């Protein structure tokens, strides 16, 4: 899986335009998309690849970095209920009492493959 560090920081209320634009641009090329949060996105990417093979995850875009667990959960929660995401798990994550949290976008099964 290709992992891209494209995160921004700051108050999540000031980042919505960036999130919406970025997510829309990336998603249009893939059949599957999933939004998530983690404290270690490299480990999380590996877990998704092993556990969710049917989605054929190809890219992980790290969108947001924050020290606030509430902000990370808020951003994830905003997107996970949408029909165009394949999020199955709902609820708040409690990952670490301190540290950094990352919101990521998973993309799988590219729509426009070039034929060889």
Feature locations, PLM:
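GIY-YIG nuclease catalytic motif and its immediate N-terminal context
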Residues: 1-85, 95-116
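Conserved phosphate- and dinucleotide-binding cores of soluble alpha/beta proteins
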Residues: 88-91
């Amino acid at each position: 899986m290709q992992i891209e560090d494209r995160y921004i920081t700051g108050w999540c209320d000031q980042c919505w335009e960036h999130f919406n634009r970025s997510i829309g641009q990336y998603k249009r090329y893939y059949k599957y998309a999933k939004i998530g949060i983690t404290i270690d996105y490299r480990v999380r990417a590996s877990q998704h690849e092993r556990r969710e093979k049917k989605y054929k995850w190809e890219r992980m875009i790290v969108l947001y970095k924050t020290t606030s667990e509430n902000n990370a959960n808020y951003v994830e929660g905003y997107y996970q209920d949408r029909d165009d995401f394949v999020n199955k798990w709902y609820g708040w994550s409690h990952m670490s009492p301190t540290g950094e949290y990352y919101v990521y976008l998973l993309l799988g099964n590219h729509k426009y493959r070039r034929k060889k």
